[in-house]
Amino acid sequence: MLLRTLSLALGLGLALGGTASAADRLGSYRIDPAQISVSGISSGAFMANQLHIAHSATFMGAGLVAGGLYGCAVMTADEKGVRPLASIATGACMSAPALLQPATTYAERIRRFAAQGWIDPVEGLGRSRLYAFTGKADRVVNPETVRRGVEVYGLLGLPTAALSFSDEAIDAGHAWVTQAYGVPCPDNRAPYINACEYDQARMVLQTLYGPLQDRATRLSGRFVAFDQTEFAPGGQAAPSGLWDTGHLYVPAACETEGATCRLHVVLHGCKQSAQELGDTFYRHVGVNEWADSNRILVLYPQARTVNVNDFPTPRLTDIFNINPEGCWNWWGYAYDTRYLFKDGVQVKAIWQMVQRLAGRSD
């Protein structure tokens, strides 16, 4: 589901077919600035982790499902930034946990990055809340990667009381887990949404926001398709790994005059974007039903595949910078060696979407 192997990445140069539909400009709502959070599955978990750590003064919590160890694919880091490798992503981060660095190494890097001003001060992480999940049958991302990520949060001040960690307690494959929608629970296959009689959406939102009203049995709100290209450098979404169109779920209560709502960002994994699955992910992972009855807007940014033809100026190294499975950028593809930081292309794009929704300037 994530980038399977480095050789697979080098061997795939064609993007999946299809184009995004026309979409409107993303609007603004009355958002409680203290109630903005993020979650994700697989590559989306790594990106959720990157967003949370880069902007911990704003994101009050994160949900990490089957992924999420900050800087896991980094080979070296210095005062100029990082040098990541896809081979570390597919090796240590996914299948060879013995090659992972100690949690103290990742935590110290985060402190150094904060000292450089590339991410928010780490003190914000100590005031956060965290949901983490790894399935017992996950054969894509080794559970130790998720455990190591949780350990890093602890070293940076996250209290145990603010953590909900399902550590191989459920026989789930590599997937976002639902009560009844998707393939059988232990499977490691598309669409990577598994029916496990476990309401992961509820657990994520309850961990981050506390007690919830009962989920809606029928959605009251609407889905909004919005233009993501304006958030991409130069308006060119494809070379950045961004799909042209993102999606937003707006509960009816959030469109009532004077109503204040919360905002939760949900990030799909590889092979789960609208480019690949249409509306399957953003309609069927169960988040909207809980959001609807609890005044939570849900932002679903969309990644896309990147192939050599998407780069405007051909270079011999383009083949090393592609993204054949539509993953979020957690190993520095598309020449983005700043992908971990506030000025990383995708981190910045999603951050600007959040700022727009909250009615703030960048």
Put a short name on every predicted segment:
Residues 259-271:
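Short beta-strand element of the alpha/beta-hydrolase
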Residues 278-296:
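Short amphipathic alpha-helix adjacent to the substrate-entry channel of hydrolases
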Residues 93-115, 194-201, 208-258, 339-342:
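N-terminal cap/lid segment of alpha/beta-hydrolase-fold proteins
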Residues 30-83, 116, 213, 361-362:
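Primarily recognizes the serine-hydrolase "nucleophile elbow" in alpha/beta-hydrolase
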Residues 154-184:
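Catalytic histidine neighborhood in serine/cysteine hydrolases
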Residues 41, 129-138, 268-269, 302:
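Conserved strand-to-loop "acid loop" that flanks and positions the catalytic carboxylate
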Residues 72-156, 161, 204, 250, ...:
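The feature captures the conserved acid-bearing segment of alpha/beta-hydrolase catalytic domains
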Residues 26, 75-78, 83-93, 180-182, ...:
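Cap/lid segment of the alpha/beta-hydrolase catalytic domain
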